[in-house]
Swiss-Prot record:
Annotated GO CC locations: membrane
UniProt keyword Phosphoprotein, yes or no: no
Pfam family, one: p450
CDD domains, sorted: cytochrome_P450 (cd00302)
Protein role: Cytochrome P450 monooxygenase; part of the gene cluster that mediates the biosynthesis of the dimeric xanthones cryptosporioptides. The pathway begins with the synthesis of atrochrysone thioester by the polyketide synthase dmx-nrPKS. The atrochrysone carboxyl ACP thioesterase dmxR1 then breaks the thioester bond and releases the atrochrysone carboxylic acid from dmx-nrPKS. Atrochrysone carboxylic acid is decarboxylated by the decarboxylase dmxR15, and oxidized by the anthrone oxygenase dmxR16 to yield emodin. Emodin is then reduced to emodin hydroquinone by the oxidoreductase dmxR7.
Binding site for heme: 451
Official protein name in the record: Cytochrome P450 monooxygenase dmxR5
Source organism of this protein record: Cryptosporiopsis sp. (strain 8999)
Residue ranges crossing the lipid bilayer per the database entry: 24-44
GO process terms (BP): sterol metabolic process
Main EC class the enzyme belongs to: oxidoreductase
Length: 508
């Protein structure tokens, strides 16, 4: 039998790696060059005049003072302890920052026309928008040197506007605590309980109640603002050029907010549109541009609740922790409400409904004392400015940033003996400690940048707290948490988690 011889097996040649070695070496070298160039870019810092304060050692390679974002108060204290002059420099990514302390530096920080308040926000990491350029609503020169934002903020807090909104403010606030009475647990987080009405009233005052009354748009907006207030972005401050998921998320949120406000503004600006007596109508009647109106409203509803969402809840926690002050405030509420009541025998909440604006603003001295002390202890932050002057041979060079930490003032033993203890009586007339230094209290801003929303913030708190105390007696669950006055998180402002008990007042 003939057999066909099989084909000889193929000869497998060994793979010659030498063929690929040059390409592999070239690729690895290219990656290494790119990596080294990137690290060199991160490490590069420009030179400065010798007047600049010495740099703190509390930094991290390549990115600089990351603790400024992560543990800001620890970073401040550690850098000050190291400093021989009470000042220090540090890098936030590529941004040069000067930390200041002392009375003279504080006065310069507050009064200098070259230190820009809006520009300082670039190192906070909380904005929805890319850092530069400064939005037009914040640029000076709109009216007597003021920005569009400041001018309209002031307009919307005029007496006529507040009187117009007052019935809605009081009815909403009362409604919050009427609803809370249905909770069988008798325990709540006051900050969470008040957050809805605080934000709703900010939207009503600075835009229109049409948004608040929209059953779909308002809950979504409330949730979005709540998330945004608790966030601060490390990469936005240290690596602003780096595309991140967080940055894209912020851009989507900004776009969504515009989708809420733009249709309302467009509808109201049409010829023959139904008029409403609100702040949106005020801007339309003034002939303000559409883009300025939309940017103002978005900025206002983000900025306005930043502190009020914290302080309103904390004020109730304070009332719960200090029964004597709660009862003083309650007695003042009862006396004032009765003096304006149509029926002095009606429930206290009904009596409050009849009070005029001037009574709401000036009739609660104990609440005012407690609020000022609360602001002292809780507004413990790093204030930030940017030098927008053209001179580079300065202590704070042109383009650099300056920060001042308010804990130096608000927790000064000289100005506030026993500063970590809540003592509203320290603000009674005749107590001159706080007058010992220039700007001994900066809770409402000072100098060239006083808080433009102070009137509204105090009125809003008075209304909310008055109805809360009229309906309930508050008791502290944890009598220590109210003393916590600083955060070691980022620059965001998450809601406090403290709980308080509430029980109906017998007289109601």
């Amino acid at each position: 039998m003939n057999s066909t011889p099989s084909a000889p097996p193929l000869k497998m040649e060994a793979l010659d790696l030498d063929i690929f070695q040059p390409s592999l070496t070239l690729g690895l070298g290219a990656i290494l060059v790119v990596l080294m160039s990137f690290l060199a870019f991160l490490s590069y810092t420009p030179s400065f005049d010798k007047k600049v304060p010495a740099f703190t050692t509390h930094t991290h390679p390549f990115i600089g003072a990351a603790d400024f974002m992560w543990r800001k108060n620890h970073f401040w204290r550690a850098s000050m302890e190291e400093s021989k002059t009470g000042t220090f420099s540090f890098w936030v990514g590529k941004k040069h920052v000067v930390g200041l302390s002392g009375e003279a530096a504080r006065k310069t920080f507050m009064d200098s026309p070259g230190l820009d308040f809006v520009g300082g926000a670039r190192i906070r990491g909380v904005s929805l928008l890319p850092n530069p350029p400064t939005p037009e609503i914040f640029r000076p020169g709109f009216h007597h040197g003021r920005s569009f934002f400041l001018r309209r903020m002031i307009d919307m807090q005029k007496t006529e506007m507040l009187k117009r909104c007052l019935p809605r403010f009081t009815s909403d606030s009362r409604g919050v605590f009427d609803e809370l009475a249905k909770d069988p647990s008798g325990i709540t987080n006051p900050a969470v309980a008040c957050w809805h009405v605080v934000f709703a009233h900010d939207v009503i005052l600075f835009c229109s109640e049409e948004i608040v009354d929209d059953p779909k748009a308002f809950p979504n907006l409330l949730q979005m603002i709540d998330i945004l207030q608790g966030l601060s972005s490390f990469t936005k401050v240290f690596l602003p050029w780096l595309p991140t998921m967080a940055g894209m998320t912020r851009a989507r949120r900004y776009k969504y907010m515009k989708s809420i406000f733009e249709p309302l503004v467009d509808r109201r600006m049409k010829r023959g549109a139904i008029r409403r007596e609100d702040s949106l109508q005020l801007m339309i009647d003034n002939g303000d541009r559409r883009d300025l109106i939309i940017d103002f409203v978005i900025a206002a509803v983000i900025i306005a609740p930043t502190n009020s969402r914290i302080l309103t809840g904390q004020m109730l926690n304070v009332m719960a922790a200090y029964p004597s002050w709660q009862e003083k405030a309650y007695a003042e509420i009862k006396a004032l409400a009765k003096s304006y009541a149509k029926d002095p025998e009606a429930p206290l909440a009904d009596q409050l409904d009849s009070m005029p604006l001037e009574a709401w603003e000036a009739g609660f001295p104990s609440i005012d004392l407690c609020f000022k002390e609360l602001v002292r202890m809780w507004v413990a932050i790093s204030m930030m400015r940017r030098n927008i002057s053209s001179r580079t041979d300065e202590f704070i060079p042109a383009g650099s940033f300056a920060i001042y930490n308010t804990t130096e003032t608000h927790f000064s033993e000289e100005l506030y003996p026993d500063p970590h203890t809540f003592k509203p009586e320290r603000w009674l007339e005749g107590n001159a400690n706080v007058q010992k230094q220039a700007y001994g209290f900066v809770g409402w801003g000072e100098g060239r940048h006083p808080c433009p929303g102070k009137r509204w913030a105090k009125l809003q708190l008075n209304i909310t707290i008055a109805y809360a105390l009229a309906k309930f007696k508050w008791t502290s669950v944890d009598k220590t948490e109210h003393k916590k006055s600083t955060q070691e998180s980022g620059h965001g402002v998450p809601l406090p988690s403290k709980l308080s008990k509430f029980s109906p007042r017998e007289e109601n």
